[in-house]
UniProtKB/Swiss-Prot annotation:
PROSITE patterns: ANK_REP_REGION, ANK_REPEAT, PARP_CATALYTIC, SAM_DOMAIN
Entry protein name: Poly [ADP-ribose] polymerase tankyrase-2
Single GO BP term: positive regulation of telomere maintenance via telomerase
Reactions the enzyme catalyzes: NAD(+) + (ADP-D-ribosyl)n-acceptor = nicotinamide + (ADP-D-ribosyl)n+1-acceptor + H(+); L-aspartyl-[protein] + NAD(+) = 4-O-(ADP-D-ribosyl)-L-aspartyl-[protein] + nicotinamide; L-glutamyl-[protein] + NAD(+) = 5-O-(ADP-D-ribosyl)-L-glutamyl-[protein] + nicotinamide
Gene encoding the protein: TNKS2
Lineage: Eukaryota, Metazoa, Chordata, Craniata, Vertebrata
Means of activity regulation: Specifically inhibited by XAV939, a small molecule, leading to inhibit the Wnt signaling pathway by stabilizing AXIN1 and AXIN2. Inhibited by talazoparib.
Ligand binding (Zn(2+)): 1081, 1084, 1089, 1092
Length: 1166
């Protein structure tokens, strides 16, 4: 700060500066500085009001007064012409000074007089930077309320939030007094809410409860004024709470009609669904909110949508009357919508004698009114159909408009003729006392006025305001009504104009000459034959006229060219012809309306599309300052999206509107950028907002899965940060880089770990995410972890060498099997257990995202014996340990006191003496024996160390001569099979090199398993159905310490969120580095590596009553009445059997097998 300005941002150096200028100016500056308003009034003149402190920072009097918070002086200076945007030497405006020193009232005053809240000084500091740096909370709020942009960066690239004092940070994150804001919305305290409301917190969510936004609360408590204010300030009508309820759900549930109307008028989705697929109409119908139901139906609510219980809103209606009303009004609104769109097929579907005169509950429109107003070409046919069915031709709306009024106002002359011929009352009056002629005259529809006059409409009727039709018309209409139709043109020209209008191409050919081709309608709008032909959609006439010299640029009296006419009435072929013949698409009439303005205002989607394709500028403004987008009617969302261009696609992707995305996306814009924000692509937004279907569609149509935004984030970062598992899995399927880094070297795994996204972490690790990568601060994902589950997951995945000591797992390792000598206890295994977590998986299928395998128990005698053999707890080895020390006589004490080996390692002399071992020598021998067992000189596994918790894991090395070793090895070797993928996932091999087999002993896990086995056996007629099965996973380390954990299972597996096992070791081998082999071994990234050691578990699994399944079935739990699922091989399904359990305690990791796959004989590298 000090390097870019005087201390105080201009104000504090005021005094010194004032001393160095001429006396008169110095006196004025001093008066402003001291707040002496009387002296200021005496000294200020128009010449001096913006004088400069030439000896200082070239500040103005307003700079001084603002910096010192002299509100009265500031007000006087502004009233007398002080320049609110004046800049000093450092580029500061008075607002900078006021903000820097926290003068909130002065800030308000300056902003009201037009001060720019985003003005930047020479270092790109805005007033918000100033206020934030100094911790001026009130000023920050005022600035944000007046449009200050918090994302602006100074020349150092820092935003206001980056530089903010701790006290102001909460304002810039939207967290400042969030609870008070939410309470004010709930209680209806407007003053309190407006004092706190900013664009940064208008959509904040409560930290507890239902995670409601202010709009949720205001809607639920019927705070109409609060709802209006929130909507005016950008509240999101689509915001969802914890149960996916939108504010409209709340308003409808409690029957708040006005709030409901406000929300739907601001675009709330009337068919939005919560987590249970309840729509707002479900809520209103179930609570018997009759009027709200009617309102929702009028805005397109569908009462046939089903919730999660397969119940529609009609089903939930508590009374027969409401059920009937819902069905009736739904049919009626469907008929009205079909009439608006002039859709003959849908009209015939919904039309009946009962429905033909259905009236809109709010506007009282009938289908005939809607058809009369329809811009579509089949409106005449629809009107005739309705009239044949008995539509009331003189029915009036709430404003007393008849169908004739509506058609006349729209200049739909074809409908005017139809309804008049069916005896419509031509002089019917609306609520303003106006006839159809009044409305046609007011809109300047000359031909409509002629038509109405010809049918006997009285031009002398006076409206309630005292006007006749003549008085309301423009010059042409007035002339028509006063004098009748004049024949100012020559008879030949008149006939040519009429022929062009009527589409009589033969007459046009006969009369058209070089002189007459561009003749004018003298009595009318000075239109040419091309104007008429274009406006009346006479394609063949237009084509002929253009070929014979018609001026495509000719303007009528209002500055309209033929293209204006064609676009206004939606004549696509004509417009296309005119453009091909050189019509200027950005030409403007006298009111600066372009053809795009006309087409947009009239809802002509295809015309808008054509014009934009040929270079029409959607940013051009008419005389009223409106762009084409500003003129689009509320219901024309397709045109709004078209005109918004890339912004509409980004919005649709963000809101998850698949239909809009399909309509708006193309190969040219599928990777467009949010240029006003983070330069996100549609895929970034779809991923961040969990819009799975949209993300999938974008990826299928060329979206760049690894596109980076301004911060270097790819879509996978967004999905990972917000915990969107399904979206993340989809992105990975389309080859998203799981180790991509942003500008701060954060990977998706950093994001997921920091936010406690357990499922996401499991998914990323399973697909090759590297947990050792560090961000710019030198932090791994484990350093940022915020949840215990995530911590356990990352710890299991980290190579032991990369783990901090506090995270290293603890285990007793190197214990020999019974029968080993005493020396063996002091010489542990020479090769370490490679319990490192391997890379990734292609699909998450089970616990910790691993798909597991199993060994067939029917293969060998050894397997059968293994299944029958009980696995004792840790205490089985205490007898052998004591015997090896020659202290067998102490076993009675150990058995009496229930001392197991894991308890013994925690005991010292005092504890041993207390249980009755009085001889010092015996105690010493026991303690030293334990020390030798666990000391670093025993060749302990570098990945596993002592756990002193009393519930740790002991790994017991089996001797290759041991029958148990040989039985397990035989199971491994005999269950190798050739797989359909040709070795892609698990490598190319036909046998293993078994390096080590260790028995896993964990008393806690064993007791948990046996308890569950007993439960299953009791539930299955005393038959546990226990099997010895293989399990492959990159998380072996976590499993042998903590057991299997179904909480980390992912629903994306073939049989849902279970833990998977297999009979064949080669199948489990496919998953030791992740699903599909992940990225291969950690060192060589090779799925067929013959060097690196692998590890597999041979597990005891209780299957109980198993459900046989041949095809994929997504389940979160075992099928009812069953304990597991058995996936059987089939022609188009599995090649080898799979076994799935859904509770981790149904399996015990009995053997840890360390091995290598062996290269087949005769196979060469490459």
């Amino acid at each position: 700060m000090s390097g870019r300005r005087c201390a105080g941002g201009g104000a504090a150096c005021a005094s010194a500066a004032a001393e160095a200028v001429e006396p008169a100016a110095r006196e004025l500056f001093e008066a402003c500085r001291n707040g002496d308003v009387e002296r200021v009034k005496r000294l200020v003149t128009p010449e001096k009001v913006n004088s400069r402190d030439t000896a200082g920072r070239k500040s103005t009097p307003l700079h001084f007064a603002a910096g010192f918070g002299r509100k009265d002086v500031v007000e006087y200076l502004l009233q007398n012409g002080a320049n609110v945007q004046a800049r000093d030497d450092g580029g500061l405006i008075p607002l900078h000074n006021a903000c820097s020193f926290g003068h909130a009232e002065v800030v308000n005053l300056l902003l009201r007089h037009g001060a720019d809240p985003n003005a930047r000084d020479n270092w790109n500091y805005t007033p918000l930077h100033e206020a934030a740096i100094k911790g001026k909370i009130d000023v920050c709020i005022v600035l944000l309320q007046h449009g200050a942009e918090p994302t602006i960066r100074n020349t150092d690239g820092r935003t206001a939030l980056d530089l903010a004092d701790p006290s102001a940070k909460a304002v810039l994150t939207g967290e400042y007094k969030k609870d008070e804001l939410l309470e004010s919305a709930r209680s209806g305290n407007e003053e309190k809410m407006m004092a706190l409301l900013t664009p940064l917190n208008v959509n904040c969510h409560a930290s507890d409860g239902r995670k409601s936004t202010p709009l949720h609360l205001a809607a639920g408590y019927n705070r109409v004024k609060i709802v209006q204010l929130l909507l005016q300030h950008g509240a999101d009508v689509h915001a969802k709470d914890k149960g996916d309820l939108v504010p409209l759900h709340n308003a409808c549930s409690y029957g708040h009609y006005e709030v409901t109307e406000l929300l739907v008028k601001h675009g709330a989705c009337v068919n939005a669904m919560d987590l249970w697929q309840f729509t707002p109409l479900h809520e209103a119908a179930s609570k018997n909110r009759v009027e709200v139901c009617s309102l929702l139906l009028s805005y397109g609510a569908d009462p046939t949508l089903l919730n999660c219980h397969n119940k529609s809103a009609i089903d939930l209606a508590p009374t027969p009357q409401l059920k009937e009303r819902l069905a009736y009004e739904f049919k009626g609104h469907s008929l009205l919508q079909a009439a608006r769109e002039a859709d003959v097929t849908r009209i015939k579907k919904h039309l009946s004698l009962e429905m033909v005169n259905f009236k809109h509950p709010q506007t009282h429109e009938t289908a005939l009114h809607c058809a009369a107003a329809s811009p579509y070409p089949k409106r005449k046919q629809i009107c005739e159909l309705l009239l044949r069915k008995g539509a009331n031709i003189n029915e009036k709306t709430k404003e007393f408009l008849t169908p004739l009024h509506v058609a006349s106002e729209k200049a739909h002359n074809d409908v005017v003729e139809v309804v008049v011929k069916h005896e419509a009352k031509v002089n019917a009056l609306d609520n303003l006392g106006q006839t159809s002629l009044h409305r046609a005259a007011y809109c300047g529809h000359l031909q409509t006025c002629r038509l109405l006059l010809s049918y006997g409409c009285d031009p002398n009727i006076i409206s309630l305001q005292g006007f006749t039709a003549l008085q309301m018309g423009n010059e042409n209409v007035q002339q028509l009504l006063q004098e009748g139709i004049s024949l100012g043109n020559s008879e030949a020209d008149r006939q040519l104009l009429e022929a062009a209008k009527a589409g009589d191409v033969e007459t046009v050919k006969k009369l058209c000459t070089v002189q007459s081709v561009n003749c004018r309608d003298i009595e009318g709008r000075q239109s040419t034959p091309l104007h008429f032909a274009a406006g009346y959609n006479r394609v063949s006439v237009v084509e002929y006229l253009l070929q014979h010299g018609a001026d495509v640029h000719a303007k009528d009296k209002g500055g309209l060219v033929p293209l204006h006419n064609a676009c206004s009435y939606g004549h696509y072929e004509v417009a296309e012809l005119l453009v091909k013949h050189g019509a200027v698409v950005n030409v403007a009439d006298l009111w600066k309306f372009t053809p795009l303005h006309e087409a947009a205002a009239k809802g002509k989607y295809e015309i808008c599309k054509l014009l934009l394709q040929h270079g029409a500028d959607p940013t051009k403004k008419n005389r009223d300052g409106n762009t084409p987008l500003d003129l689009v009617k509320d219901g024309d969302t397709d045109i709004q999206d078209l005109l918004r261009g890339d912004a509409a696609l980004l919005d649709a992707a963000k809101k998850g509107c698949l239909a809009r995305v399909k309509k708006l996306s193309s190969p040219d814009n599928v990777n467009c950028r949010d240029t006003q924000g983070r330069h996100s692509t549609p895929l970034h937004l779809a991923a961040g907002y969990n819009n799975l279907e949209v993300a999938e569609y974008l990826l299928q149509h060329g979206a760049d899965v690894n596109a980076q935004d301004k911060g270097g984030l790819i879509p996978l970062h967004n999905a990972a940060s917000y915990g969107h598992v399904d979206v993340a899995a989809l992105l990975i399927k389309y080859n998203a880089c799981v180790n991509a880094t942003d500008k701060w070297a954060f990977t998706p795994l950093h994001e997921a770990a920091q936010k406690g996204r357990t499922q996401l972490c499991a998914l990323l690790l399973a697909h090759g995410a590297d947990p050792t990568l560090k961000n710019q601060e030198g932090q791994t994902p484990l350093d940022l972890v915020s949840a215990d589950d995530v911590s356990a997951l990352l710890t299991a995945a980290m190579p032991p060498s990369a783990l901090p000591s506090c995270y290293k797992p603890q285990v007793l390792n190197g214990v020999r099997s019974p029968g080993a000598t005493a020396d063996a206890l002091s010489s542990g295994p020479s090769s370490p257990s490679s319990l490192s977590a391997a890379s990734s998986l292609d699909n998450l299928s089970g616990s910790f995202s691993e798909l597991s395998s199993v060994v067939s128990s029917s293969g060998t005698e050894g397997a059968s014996s293994l299944e029958k053999k009980e696995v004792p707890g840790v205490d089985f080895s205490i007898t052998q340990f004591v015997r090896n020390l020659g202290l067998e006589h102490l076993m009675d004490i150990f058995e009496r006191e229930q001392i197991t080996l894991d308890v013994l390692v925690e005991m010292g002399h005092k504890e041993l003496k207390e249980i009755g071992i009085n001889a010092y020598g015996h105690r010493h021998k026991l303690i030293k024996g334990v020390e030798r067992l666990i000391s670093g000189q025993q060749g302990l596994n570098p990945y596993l160390t002592l756990n002193t918790s009393g519930s740790g894991t002991i790994l017991i090395d089996l001797s290759p001569d041991d029958k148990e070793f040989q039985s397990v090895e035989e199971e491994m070797q005999s269950t190798v099979r050739e797989h359909r993928d040709g070795g892609h996932a698990g490598g190319i091999f036909n046998r293993y090199n078994i390096l080590k087999i260790q028995k896993v002993c964990n008393k806690k896990l064993w007791e948990r398993y046996t308890h569950r086995r007993k439960e299953v056996s009791e539930e299955n007629h005393n038959h546990a159905n226990e099997r010895m099965l293989f399990h492959g996973s990159p998380f072996v380390n976590a499993i042998i310490h903590k057991g299997f954990d179904e909480r980390h299972a992912y629903i994306g597996g073939m049989f849902g969120a279970g833990i998977y096992f297999a009979e064949n070791s080669s199948k489990s081998n496919q998953y030791v580095y992740g699903i599909g082999g992940g990225t291969g071994c950690p060192v060589h990234k090779d799925r067929s590596c013959y060097i690196c050691h692998r590890q597999l578990l041979f597990c005891r699994v209780t299957l109980g009553k198993s459900f046989l399944q041949f095809s994929a079935m997504k389940m979160a739990h075992s099928p009812p009445g069953h304990h597991s699922v058995t996936g059987r091989p089939s022609v188009n399904g599995l090649a080898l059997a799979e076994y799935v359990i859904y509770r981790g305690e149904q399996a015990y990791p009995e053997y840890l097998i360390t091995y290598q796959i062996m290269r087949p004989e005769g196979m060469v590298d490459g």
